Curated annotation (Swiss-Prot):
Function text: Involved in DNA repair and RecF pathway recombination.
Similarity comment: Belongs to the RecO family.
Signal peptide: none
Gene name tied to this protein: recO
Gene3D superfamilies: Nucleic acid-binding proteins, Recombination protein O, C-terminal domain
Record bears the keyword DNA damage: yes
Record-given protein name: DNA repair protein RecO
GO terms, biological process: DNA recombination; double-strand break repair
Keywords linked to the UniProt accession: DNA damage, DNA recombination, DNA repair
Cross-referenced InterPro entries: ARFGAP/RecO, DNA_rep/recomb_RecO_N, NA-bd_OB-fold, RecO, RecO_C
Length: 240
């Protein structure tokens, strides 16, 4: 199959043999595509190597043969955001999450839109944690894994003052008592869930619980195997 003039975001790149690269690209029309870029070394290939970097929006043509497509041509369509510190790790995170969750060669246009929006958000001065929670919510929605952010698992309206445990299958389970500190760590306030559903940033005190709860849901859909970027973010937080 010939893929011509397709737009996509570079999610991941690694060296293959001495002069080639294996590139994972998220596209709107073909889903996540694996590319084999041969012979990218040398001064004449400098522009191509620069284009094949994570977070970069490219236009490419390739021939699909089996699992990997043979890259014929690629060029950068813009300048990828220059991220540093926490935002750089966040960029790694959004790419790794879609590398793991986006289906190969199966288009999910909503995921392409999620990535484009998150990429723009990371380049802004807006609150980073809130941008990532919105991204996670939209990714789950795009994959058909969204849960009700207005009602709990019993169909009752979510109570802003109550706490809930997020179940990947059943949604928000109301917690009637919290006997241990660990119980509280594993729950999220109803106010935070309602805010997420209304696309309004929750109170700062509610953000850690929302992060942990969303991570638990994502971990389920990742097959129980976490992300490298999660560990990197935790290591960074411990060093501060």
């Amino acid at each position: 199959m010939l893929i011509e003039h397709e737009r996509g975001f570079v999610l991941h790149v690694r060296a293959w043999r001495e002069t080639s690269l294996l590139v994972e690209v998220l596209t709107e029309q073909h889903g996540r595509v694996g590319l084999l870029a041969r012979g990218v070394q040398g001064p004449r290939k400098q522009a191509l190597r620069a284009a094949l970097q994570p977070l970069q929006l490219i236009q490419f043509s390739a021939v699909q043969r089996g699992e990997l497509a043979q890259l014929r041509q690629a060029e950068a369509l813009d300048t990828a955001p220059r991220l540093v510190g926490d935002t750089m790790l966040a960029g790694f995170y959004i790419s790794e999450l879609l590398l793991r969750l986006a289906p190969r060669n199966d288009p999910v246009p909503e995921l392409y839109a999620c990535y484009a929006q998150a990429r723009t958000y990371l380049a802004s001065d807006l609150p980073l944690a809130w941008g990532l929670r919105r991204f996670e919510r939209d990714v789950l929605d795009g994959l058909g894994f969204a849960f009700d952010l207005q009602h709990d698992s019993d169909g009752q309206p979510i109570d802003p003052a109550a706490r809930y445990r997020l179940d990947p299958q059943e949604g928000a389970l109301r917690v009637l008592s919290e006997r241990l500190a660990q119980d509280r760590r594993e729950t999220v306030t109803g106010a935070a869930l309602l805010a997420l559903g209304e696309d309004v940033m929750p109170d700062a005190d509610d953000m850690p619980g929302l992060r942990r709860s969303m991570r638990g849901v994502l971990l389920h859909h990742l097959g129980g195997r976490g992300l490298k970027s999660w560990q990197m973010l935790e290591d960074l937080a411990r060093r501060r």
